Amino acid sequence: MQRTGDGERPRFFQQDLDVIPDDKGSDLFIQTAEGPDGHVDDEVIEDKTRFITNLKEVLGALPDDILEGYWNSYGASKDGLSKAIQQHFEGKETKGCSDAHDDLNTETQNSQNTIVNGHVSNQIKRASEGGLPILKRKKQLCCWRRFLGSTQVNAMATRPTAQPLKYGSELLIRRTSGQPNNSGLRSRKKPGFSQYVRFCDATSSRELGRLPEDISEILHTLLQTPGVEFKATMIFCNSKRLSVGDLFVVRLDCFVTSLLFDPALPGKAEDEQFQQRNRALMLLFKNLNMTPLAEGADLVPEKPEFYDLEEDESITDATVNSPTASDDYMDLNQLRNFYRSTQESASIFKLRETTPPVDKFQLELRRYQKQGLTWMLLREREHAILEPGSQDALADGPMDPMWRMFKWPRDTSWDVSRGTTYVSLEADIPDKFYANLHTGEFSLVKPISKSILKGGILADEMGLGKTISILALITMVPSDTKHLLTTAQEKPPVGHLSLELGISTVKPYTASTTLIVVPMSLLPQWRNEFVRVNDGNGLYCEVYYAGNVSNLRTLLVKQKSPPSVVLTTYGVVQTEWSKLQQFDYEASNEGLFSVEFFRIILDEGHNIRNRTTKTSKAVMALTSRRKWVLTGTPIMNRLDDLFSLIKFMNFEPWCKIDYWRQFVSDPFEKKDYSSALEVIQAVMGPILLRRTKNMKDEDGNPLVQLPPKEVVIEMIRFSDTEAGLYKYFLSKAEHSVKESLARGDLLKKYSTILLHILRLRQVCCHFKLLGSQDENDEDLKNMKLINDIPDISTLLGEDSQSPGSSSEGMPDFIEDFKTKYPNSDALKDLECSICTCEAISPLTSVVFTRCGHPFCESCLLEYIQFQNKKGSETICPNCRAAVESRYLLKLEDINGKLEPVPYSNTKKSSKIVALIRHLKHLQDTSANEQVVVFSQFSSYLDILENELRQSFASDICEIYKFDGRLDLKERSNVLAKFTEKSLVKMKVLLLSLKAGGVGLNLTCASHAFIMDPWWSPGMEDQAMDRIHRIGQSNTVKIYRFIVENSIEEKMLRIQEKKRSLGEFVDADEEERRRSRIEEIKMLFA
């Protein structure tokens, strides 16, 4: 290492390599040169000023006399700027940073000259062609250099050597002329990167070998990138001379200099060289295992100082392609990591708690809700409302989503590990640095996100009180106070009027009104919750639905006290938007689209996840100054679900589809899941808050204390009749699947096979469902074959008739019955001899034996089954007469009159029998219990309603049904009646999984029955969360009915697999169908 004078520092870089002039020949750094500020009339003075300004940008601060001399000598020349720069570097000294530069040691010239670039004069010539320099930079000279990492590669010899290479000998890396094949298609005419990057002997400059393709791709680009340097050292060649094709191990040390951190360095995103440079930087960081730090992290594992060549799996072989294929799917574990990263970035548990004033908000928030309220107020920049110090956790502001924070690794370069000492200008360099590998920018200062978005996504898990949390925000900030204060003394803005229509083209700003868009089923619940928390504080809510408001714009703009909240539904928004698309200008002057709201809140915001639907487009057209999305599932099917939410909030620049595709969609479709998720996590971190029931606060306490939840899977056995029907449809389904597999067209028969599966599921519930359609299955919509089924009575054969209807003694039995019970009065106070229940009710649930004794239907059937299992004769508990299944009667309401008819058990659903048995037990143990029964088949709910009404009298049990066929008023009445506690009656709510699976608060019930399973376990979890959520005070017990040895049992296994491995988040619809095909194969395996 060469020494300078006493007290001088050793230097590391050559003078010609430290100065990185502009390179117009590269599209990487093209920017538009700007002249001096202000207008100058004298053309000569303007040219001189421009010449000196651009000269300073390349050379830094110089004395005025030197600059004047360069202008006098070269100002009039066409390429004068190039000549002035060349003259300066050939014979002049610069000031400032050059002083430190001249102190650097030049003895290590060869070791630092591992990058073979073109001569400075040639670079300057290319940079100045056509006029002005193309880089703007305050400092051109390297002021410091830091070690970034090391990697080891297996190089392949391309030239023989006369003697072995010495251990530790230095190698040069040379980039030869020519262009590699960037398309990925290797050919003889277009060789790869490894043909253009070679190792050379540092002493003789003789070529020795080539590098692996992936390493060559990195070096080919970065060798000509200012601020990145490499040093190559030979560390293994088996102590023999090299022949062509031999492998030898080379260590690459990578360094970065201050030039890489020059803010003027990055070029334009559309430039090919710029994109290649950024890709090379990404590959370099990946190869060096540079792992980003989470905000607030201090340490990362340091790399070992010594390497074991035999165990180091990071060595890249020149003969093997190193990139590996990514998995073809993403699972729920990755989504959980995504949510976890957003929770960490929000620093939610470090925020102070904000409590709404008790005179304004009637409820007491939980601790995590108070912290969430602070986060929401910060998102809306309502700092004046917050207590001092509330924003300390986010004082510095969130880091820009595209940037990552890294810690400088410990210097384990070859020279340092061998004890070589040197002095470097690193004293003032922070121990962390920041990189945006997508744009190629580097910084030593934390880049702060500068989004102007006011709002965010509250994605708390279902049941944690998102509704109450957002209502607390509305109570705290009901209006735009700053706007109201500034406009109090001003006249309202007058828009331009259309001469033809007389309609203002400027939307008035409703600074005191928040619009909340909800699913129709949740409209009554939101209204009730608003009244409950804001009772008596002066705020009021207006429901905008079914034309109840004649002119919304007048209501919001011209009234002195407009509503604080307007509640409407997605359907209303879509309807009004559709009218606007038909050029109905009156609608734009009256409805939701005629004003700009203060705030818009979307409940169940995932309803707009498909941006191509009318609902999504309509919601996007609404305008406001603050926007919020409430959803427990921001990602449902695809990663692009998030784009619609971001677009709704106008989150720049991510709301632009081209930007989103470049950084999210395209990498995802190319199976680069890690890159796509990395960007998503960074983007969503500042604007998304998610808490789950299992999370704990800063003190280690659970966020919410909920009572226990017990889920019981009850296996149901088919009756003989159901088993016969199931076997018939199963054989048809298996035959269809086997044929499709044999022909290889299973995907083409997708809908037909799903139809077979649907029929099997329907038989498991009730054979009367055959011919109806699953309202949740999008794949079977409008399918013509849905009603193409054989006659059920034909399939049942003799079982379709009552066993006793054709018996010779049945007419006599009916006559004897009518004699014993001549009228309805004789049927009063009937008692079951098995359960000793007096006054069996309703009478339609009574079954009479041949001897004329009455019994509860469920009691008698259980008794017969019990005796059959024992192999004993079934006899009447009263008179000991034989009981035969073919001689049973029941009462049926015919035209308002009860008539005896032969009883048949063949038309009974085993699941319904089990449900009735459980309900009767609940009635006996807790007469006023409230129960929810879930199913995804609306027609099944109809069957259940009829069966339950026949089994339970109205004076002891009330049955309610809630599905998509009810209008808003009917839904409100059903929920109000069900939630009202009765002291003597049991209440049963039959609930459609689609209509009531989300949003509803049914904590009044503590028992639930899920009658049929669904493909996704998440659907059933949502149903359970309607009951097991905040407000529940009792232990929750949930029964899931599964028919054993049926398709339902296999669906249960698929659910278990999804829970353990995760559900697919597919890139497109075709992949979603393929994943369903895999499930189909499992069902018929």
From Swiss-Prot:
Domain Helicase C-terminal: 914-1072
Region described as Disordered: 92-118
CDD domains per UniProt: DEXDc_SHPRH-like, RING-HC_RAD5, SF2_C_SNF
Broad class of where this protein is predominantly found: cytoplasm
Biological processes per GO annotation: DNA repair
UniProt-listed SUPFAM superfamilies: P-loop containing nucleoside triphosphate hydrolases, RING/U-box
This enzyme's EC code(s): 3.6.4.-
InterPro entries named among the record's database cross-references: Helicase_ATP-bd, Helicase_C-like, HIRAN, P-loop_NTPase, SNF2-like_sf, SNF2/RAD54-like_C, SNF2_N, SNF2_RAD54_helicase_TF
Family: Belongs to the SNF2/RAD54 helicase family.
Protein name per Swiss-Prot or TrEMBL: DNA repair protein RAD5
Species this chain originates from: Eremothecium gossypii (strain ATCC 10895 / CBS 109.51 / FGSC 9923 / NRRL Y-1056) (Yeast)
Taxonomic path: Eukaryota, Fungi, Dikarya, Ascomycota, Saccharomycotina
